[in-house]
């Protein structure tokens, strides 16, 4: 595990690291929950190491995240949303004011305030959960539809290019490098 205390000092957390632990069930980034003592009050944060194998250029990714989250928060405040800070992620700046920090090994880290009483799901189990996910996605689209400035940086080339993704799938099925096609024939 990474030295979470050392990494936490890279961010403007305005307190002292107490402890941290691996958090959640995600499989892309390394996610940790950390506790910070702020004048006698313990506050939780999410600390994430961006996966450099997936995101080859993490700094433009973080610039995208900052633009989108700042804009969504601005829109929620304009709508006088009483829970604006619960409805969008908010990046905690690094000690040098950036939306990320690089550790001595070159790993890119980010910190968000922990959103208490929030829930995440790895799998949808009910129709209501599916409806809520669709509603949340629609709300996000509405909040970011008027995002000003240049287009966002393409963090994973062709990720949203359906033609390219289908071609890659067909190639993987054809070559079947791990011999798994026969096990998933029904899905194909």
Model-predicted segments: where are they?
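A generic alpha-helix structural signal
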Residues: 8, 69, 134, 185-188
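ATP-binding pocket architecture of kinase catalytic cores
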Residues: 41-66, 71-149
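ATP-binding glycine-rich phosphate-binding loop
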Residues: 13-38
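A short linear-motif detector with a strong N-terminal bias
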Residues: 1-2, 10-13, 24-28, 88-93
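Short alpha-helix boundary/capping motifs
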Residues: 35, 75, 168-169
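ATP-dependent phospho-/nucleotidyl transfer catalytic cores
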Residues: 14, 21-25, 46-49, 55-59, ...
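Juxta-kinase regulatory segment immediately upstream of eukaryotic protein kinase catalytic domains
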Residues: 1-21, 68, 72
């Amino acid at each position: 595990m990474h030295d979470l205390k050392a990494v936490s000092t890279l961010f403007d957390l305005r307190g002292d690291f107490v402890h941290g632990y691996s958090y959640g069930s995600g499989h892309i980034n390394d996610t940790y929950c950390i506790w910070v003592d702020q004048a006698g009050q313990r506050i939780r944060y999410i600390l994430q190491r961006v996966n450099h194998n997936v995101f080859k250029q993490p700094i433009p990714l973080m610039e995208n995240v900052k633009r989108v989250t700042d804009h969504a928060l601005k829109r929620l405040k304009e709508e006088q949303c009483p829970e604006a800070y619960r409805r969008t992620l908010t990046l905690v700046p690094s000690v040098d004011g950036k939306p990320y920090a690089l550790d001595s090994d070159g790993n890119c880290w980010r910190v968000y305030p922990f959103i208490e009483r929030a829930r995440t799901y790895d799998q949808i189990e009910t129709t209501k959960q599916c409806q809520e996910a669709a509603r949340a996605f629609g709300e996000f689209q509405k909040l970011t539809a008027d995002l000003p400035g240049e287009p966002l940086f393409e963090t994973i080339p062709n990720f949203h290019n359906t033609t390219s993704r289908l071609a890659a799938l067909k190639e993987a099925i054809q070559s079947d490098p791990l011999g798994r096609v026969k096990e998933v024939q029904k899905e194909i």
